[in-house]
């Protein structure tokens, strides 16, 4: 019965064609944690209880650990992450001239792993990459998102915006149907958020571990019964860039805690 009501609710959203063009940021901007139950917000705010902090601690160890043939650590180049990495995650994804492409934070970490440490890149959703990304992003907790658009990455941003408003999957839904037109409404036991990625990498109880924003985006593809893009695919990177710009001014809150 609940499944039938859920599908009916989604069908009613999909039948409303007037909201396809809504791609601008919602007003006022609200963090994903604002839509979580009080106990989740308390858990996220408590560094001793937040389960995502286990990965942050692991990332701190990896930051200092030599890697690759030349046995170089992240700290050898950047020093103390508590100083060198403040504000860095708030500026990603971004266009990187040396590589000639848009990189998210995971991509930048792997660029350094391969180029500076002469070590094989870390796999998406691997414990090491999640931990390092969480640790670097944690240094920017409380820093407002400030991803800039320029001419080089404008086509990627435009691609992300198109994907955000594009109906897809068997349910014929777009991101905007939930996170722009219906945020704040109840969907079964959850409250629909504005869809910002400022808490990722974040701990989700349904995963029982920390996960990346791309994992969460892929879950949305699965939810509307669409083909899921591969990790690191151009579509997911474009969506990440668009969402980061859309969240401009919202503070990072890594590691977020979600149901």
Language model: regions and residue ranges:
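Short coil/turn and helix-start
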Residues: 68-69, 169, 230
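Conserved short C-terminal alpha-helix that flanks the catalytic cleft of nucleotide-sugar-dependent
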Residues: 63, 163-164
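Short cysteine/histidine-rich metal-coordination sites, predominantly Zn2+-binding motifs
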Residues: 89-98, 191-200
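N-terminal, post-signal-peptide region of Sec/Tat-exported proteins
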Residues: 47-80
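C-terminal cap of thioredoxin/glutaredoxin-like
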Residues: 162, 169, 177-183, 199-205, ...
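The canonical Cys-X-X-Cys-His
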Residues: 71-81, 132, 160, 170-182, ...
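Post-cleavage N-terminal segment of exported redox proteins
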Residues: 2-5, 9-56, 83, 93-158, ...
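Short Cys/His-rich "knuckle" micro-motifs
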Residues: 84-87, 185-189
